[in-house]
Amino acid sequence: MNIQIFGGNAVKQFNLGSQGKELLGAGPYEYFYYQTGTDEEVVFSELQSFSVFVYNMPDGAVVTIEGVAEKLEQGDRVQSEGQPVSLKVQDGPVRLLVAGTIRPHPELKGLSFARYADLYRVAKPWGHELWINGQHPCYALKEIFIKAGTKTSLQYHNFKQETNVLFQGTAKLHYKANVGISNDQVKSEDTSTTQIKPVSSVDVMPKTLHRLEAMTDILLYETSTPHLDDVVRVLDDNKRPDGRLEMEHGV
């Protein structure tokens, strides 16, 4: 697979048209895409704490999970703590995102289920985030929507590692081009950009400057370590400070 490095950010391109599993990111977490067959029964059992998110399903498809009474719809999430997820698909294919860890949750066991409308929402000046697995102690899985013409902070993380996957739209990745300057002193003229299109991933390690600018409306799904408040905003169009901003929560 072709990997390009931009200021420490690793960019990969994927072709996700085939049935089966495609690994999107790995390290402290595992993150993969799974496309089912038209009619298939599949068991996910390799992770101890993980989310199964229904990214896309055709009209008329039926998705059921052993131990969950409700039929799944697009955008729904099943959370597993310490047990396999047995999924049955009829009239697919259905496209799933699965993320989690081999490390178990310290307290919880069993399956839980959430509809898309009930996922934890964080309002952003550039769009929104949905924290698909809530504020989990082992890993994070997010949906990120960024409106055309807006951009995130130019930021870095002290501890957080993340894999962002662009599924819809066109974006620019901003990165540090002037390696002779510290992250906290970077100005716009010290950065460069590269365009990314679907389906591309951006792997971001701690201390790596990055920013996404939406050329069109864009939709990403990010898996990361659970350091959700670990953000240092070097440049921000809305002058937001570092860290978690309570005004963005509870919406």
Briefly describe each language-model feature range.
Residues E46, V89, Y156-N158, A214:
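Non-cytosolic beta-sheet module surface loops
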Residues V63-I65, S80, V98, S153-L154, ...:
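Short hydrophobic/aromatic-rich beta-strand segments that constitute the beta-sheet cores
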Residues M1-V43, E70-K142, S153, V186, ...:
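A short, N-terminal "cap"/entry segment at the start of jelly-roll beta-barrel domains
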Residues Q48-V52, P93-L96, L141, K160-E162, ...:
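Short, surface-exposed beta-edge/turn micro-motifs
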Residues I146-K151, Q155, F159:
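A mid-sequence, solvent-exposed acidic-amphipathic segment
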Residues D39-G67, N158-N183:
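Glycine- and acidic-residue-biased ligand/ion/polar-headgroup-sensing regions
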Residues L72-D91, K147, Q195-T216, L220-T225:
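Conserved metal-binding segment of the jelly-roll/cupin
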